[in-house]
Amino acid sequence: MSTIKSTVLLCFVFISIVLVMFVISVIRVPQLSVEEMRSKGVFILPRPRDIAEFELRDHTGASFDRANFEGRWSFVFFGFVSCPDVCPTSMAVLGTVDRQLQSGDSELAEQFQGILVSVGRDRDSLATLGAYATAFSPRFLGVTGPREDLVELTTQVNVAFAKVPLAEALTQRTQNTEALADAYTVDHTGNIVIINPRGHYHGFIKLPHDAETIRLTYQTLAAQF
């Protein structure tokens, strides 16, 4: 009788272990290896870099500095509102990631912060920037400031930007120098910069941007941090 009981108990324990392992495999957050991330254009720094103090403004007019990065994973894109292609595309991808997270793990969603830093401050007012950034997600922030203040941040995260006159404007026969001076675009790095919850530059994601890659990268980093 005791042998039968022992056998039944062992079977029960075995089945329980199998069930637990199955449940864990189902609910385990998918993660990417460093090699997988690199193959998808995601580059994580061997040692995250501290970011020195800087001061910009968010679209509500509030000060935005290093402390605003702390406590969350920030995925930051540098662009401008009238950018015709890469900016709206990349921000739309970040918006998709945010919605996916919102429909899943609430804690993961809360720790995700999408930010657009406008490097076109001459044209992008805070109100315009706010309307643009929040169109992709009401939780997103638009941030900007004078060029010298922007450079204090961009140089620390390997982002470059420059005002470039439009070739079409330069060939126009016009005496309207004011209009000519205003005819420009802004060339800028297309990476999405990753800032970790300590406010350190953690890595970057190269173009083209993909929602699934960004979501899996975020889940991986958050789980390992």
Where does each model-flagged region fall?
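N-terminal targeting signals for export/organelle localization
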Residues: M1-E53, F225
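Hydrophobic beta-strand positions
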Residues: E55-L56, I194
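Short active-site neighborhood of thiol/selenol oxidoreductases, capturing the structured segment around
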Residues: F64-L94
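Structural microenvironment flanking redox-active thiols in thiol-disulfide oxidoreductases
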Residues: M91-T155
